[in-house]
Amino acid sequence: MTAYQAIDRHASGHRFDTERRWAAALELGFEARAESEPTPVTRLVRRRHHGPLRVQRPFYPEGKTGCCHVYLLHPPGGLVSGDELRIEATVAEGGHALLTTPAAAKLYKADSHGVAWGQHTRLQVAKDAILEYLPQETIAFDGSRGLQTTTIELATGARTLGWEVLALGRPASDLPFATGALEQRFHLSLDGQPLWLERQLLDPKHRRFNGPWGQGGATVQATLWAVGLDDEAAAIDVLRAQLPDHNRWAVTRRRGVLLLRYLGTERNEAWALCEQAWHLLRPMLASVPAHTPRIWLT
């Protein structure tokens, strides 16, 4: 079992200075178990939480022996200065889990001290296991400051598909992302060897943010990844043939990782693109059709 470091007594609580912290952590473990069915059943066998971050119960909308769906719940609904969220999930050999969230996450404006928030996600997938990480979109309010890290550790034979959809500011309310700074880090490895490393700093004051060689003034971006496809080239051909034909997205593959990117101005368009890509890729990755989580329909 992964052990969390002890939280200092001043690291979490009601403080309103530069040392303010409010920590929350969630640790999940999934295993494929041979029960009465001839096909193993993926069970949520470990669930530890600290603070306002938890799950209620697993769902099996694809049948008892199908993928185990779990909703990650953060009742506050967003991150403010000093919040520190840590999510860890492990899928053991032969298991199949899907993680999602019930609503869009919100990154609120930093306090007067400029204290940042942090969100750190670590996903571990064993041999012949599958993990789908499909959170709903994240909305960064003007003035938000924080660090988001996503670490995915795969064993040989593991498969994974996931995405991150980020909307900057609230342009419909004439509230653009004009101040603040967000940093995103991705680290995906296979047997300890890096396959995809990426660091992105989103600072509206930097010329890269509006430059055509950078963000180009786009307010919405998305990244979808997939590892474990038998034929990546064929998968790319399917995406190019069936996804909407416009210049706001592109797809490529590198070192066994399929990457689809979106850069535009429409949050719903980015989400729809990722969801449609998932519907196309899932049968190729997991040999089962996509089954939309019920929470997305509410």
From Swiss-Prot:
Highest taxon above the source species: Bacteria
Primary location class: cytoplasm
GO CC terms, sorted: cytoplasm
One MF term in the entry's GO annotations: nickel cation binding
Pfam families, A to Z: UreD
InterPro entries per record: UreD
Keywords: Chaperone, Cytoplasm, Nickel insertion
Compartments where located: Cytoplasm
Oligomeric form and interacting partners: UreD, UreF and UreG form a complex that acts as a GTP-hydrolysis-dependent molecular chaperone, activating the urease apoprotein by helping to assemble the nickel containing metallocenter of UreC. The UreE protein probably delivers the nickel.
Family: Belongs to the UreD family.
Biological role: Required for maturation of urease via the functional incorporation of the urease nickel metallocenter.
Listed HAMAP family: UreD
Protein name, as recorded: Urease accessory protein UreD
The organism of origin for this protein: Marinobacter nauticus (strain ATCC 700491 / DSM 11845 / VT8) (Marinobacter aquaeolei)
